Amino acid sequence: SIRYADMKNGERIDLGRSPSYSGRARVTSYEGMVCASNNDAAKEHEKFSNPTIVHCPDGHTVLDFGQNIAGYVKLSVKGEKGAKCRMVCGEKLDTNGNFTVENIAWKANYDTCRFQSVDFVCDGVRHDYKPKFTIMGFRYVLLLDWPEDVDAGRFSAIAVYTDMDTTFSFTSSDAMLNRIVKNTFWSVKGNFMDVPTDCPTRERAGWTGDAQLFFNTGNYMMDQRAFFRKWMRDVADCQKGNGLVYNVNPTGGKKSGLIEWISMEGSAGWGDAMVTIPYYFWKRYGDDCLIRENWQAMEKCIAYFSSRMGKRNLFSLFSPKRSKYD
């Protein structure tokens, strides 16, 4: 049964225990209105099987799937009852050829820190497993204390992202240019799982700045109409009463994030996505639905920016009285 699950950090699985309803659920209140998503579904897509087994200089065993994706690993595992093992996902090997997560994690000690990892407690029986409540950004998979000989045929990596139709293809005689286009496609796939994220590893946040900068490219390559109708509903739903648009949507509010992030909420280049994305959407698809659906939120956003203007009409995030440019 699943003993721990987190979208970012991973899962802890006790294969010897079965789910039950004997525990006690904590009753909490929820003031929001629950409604169905209007986005396309997130689905499994490309599958990478039979990874290369890498024996690193530090003695660890690593699987190389050959492509950096956002998704999860499907595997088969068997170990003695009570045996514990761990699988950690990462994007690269270091300069010595050893597995590392230092490029994506603040706490890079994968032996003790839960980050893009799955922990197993074995029960003596073989089990097929794939995560239910997490996705990870990775090409490499580190196996720690693995309870049996590593067989590449028992592992496969599956890319998971919103089911969007491809609307662009490109090929040329230049291998480097072809690779750039391919990498751009994987950037779309790796960051468009229900919310447009900055990366599929560390923050995994719906940054408005990233979304509006990449909008034209992403929507040229794939049909993202449903995707952005859903996400702009998130943005408008999170908007503050004074018109401020959070830099990340969905947001955890003022009690979440680093102090540097909180102090910059509503910044130009981020918060104005409330206006720019509906405009880009109309220009790309000839459809004004986002403008109509978000008109009031757009007006509030403009009013917020206007309230922060100084005498020379320069935006000040904190207060027009504090702008050194007036």
Across the structure, where does each feature detected by a protein language model lie?
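N-terminal hydrophobic signal/anchor transmembrane helix of membrane proteins
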Residues: 216-245
